[in-house]
Amino acid sequence: MHQTIPAVKNDGPAVDGAFFQRLDALRRAAGSGMDSLGLGPRPAPSRVLHEAAGVRLRRYEGGGEGPALLVVPSPIKAHWIWDLAPECSVVRAALARGCQVHLLEWRSVPASWGLDEHVAAVARAAAQVRGLVRQRPHLLGHSLGGTLAALCAARHPRDAASLVLVEAPLRFGSATGALADLVNSLPPGFARRFDHVPGSLLGLAASRASPEEFSTGVRLDALASALHGPRAWRRHWLAVRWTLEERPLSGRLVAQVMDALYREDRFMRGTLSLDGRRVAPRDVAVPVAAIVDPRSQVVPAASVTGFVEAAASPATLLLQYRGDVGVALQHLGALIGDSAHRELWPRVLEWLRELDRGRNGEEARAASAVSGKSDA
């Protein structure tokens, strides 16, 4: 049960967790109301391959024999921002290019789950996909989902074929951005007060940290969308509907993200321990593609590029997202914006296909060499 926490000197602000739980419920109810107006999700057909505590592994129907993808959404909101509507869906774009698309859906995650458990869940899903398609999947992650995917690639280097990071924060310190003041204003371990941190509380914190992006920007996008035409107007409200799908995070995860990553930058320093082993960017030895927004205050480009530069990747692809009308939050634009689907995702998906061609060629040459030795 969430209780009002009395204010204690140097112990952070008093927070009524029960109030924010009720606010989460009200926001989800508002989202259901928008569904009745035709503004709800219209996901591509998929089936659940596996379900366990906190997660589901989905495989989307269609596609072909192309690259195997494992999408790792941010656990903060619903997974279907990757498949918001047919005209603005990374999932459908990948299926149309023959990819085998899988997605890790975060469910009611146990309160005991921290970074170790979330990263392990990504690794298990990657292993399950590999067992199904007989090849390592490419991990794709947005925001905190990308952070978890990168940590998985560092801790479990044999599980991923490559990484695709979409505005995923990984380097902090001077690259923390607008969230730095918020994190530094709270005492270490603050989020451990909660078994689960309500999604609306996280949203309020983000809005206070960067009102230009999470408040003013949404209103300005609504106005621009109305002037831009019905397509942009509708997509704006589809994105707003998605923001109402509140998902609480375990207090343990939030505390570890705030303290170990944002406050202490342990991953970049090589002092982050995952499941008993220290990890660092140099442990990531797979190709990395990254989409950054040079305008972003929430995930500054340096928070992503700093990691890419420090990783031991044999190949990299760095793309810049410049913004769109009709995305509500520009932080979502790289997933749902017109320019992203016109300019960025075709390049990313072709890059993945080229990686697979190169990998298949190397495997064929290796098999031929082994066969030749056997014949001799």
Residue ranges: model-predicted function:
Residues 300-310:
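Short alpha-helix in the alpha/beta-hydrolase fold that links the catalytic acid
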Residues 284, 290-292:
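Short beta-strand/loop motif that positions the catalytic acidic residue
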Residues 1-11, 135, 148-252:
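Alpha/beta-hydrolase-fold enzymes
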Residues 140-141, 145, 149:
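Gly/Ala-rich beta-loop-alpha elbow adjacent to hydrolase catalytic centers
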Residues 317-376:
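Catalytic active-site module of serine/aspartate enzymes centered on a nucleophile-bearing elbow/loop
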Residues 109-112, 120-137:
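Conserved acidic catalytic loop of the alpha/beta-hydrolase fold
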Residues 44, 48-107:
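Short, surface-exposed "cap/lid" segments of acyl-processing enzymes
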Residues 294-299:
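Acidic catalytic loop of the alpha/beta-hydrolase fold
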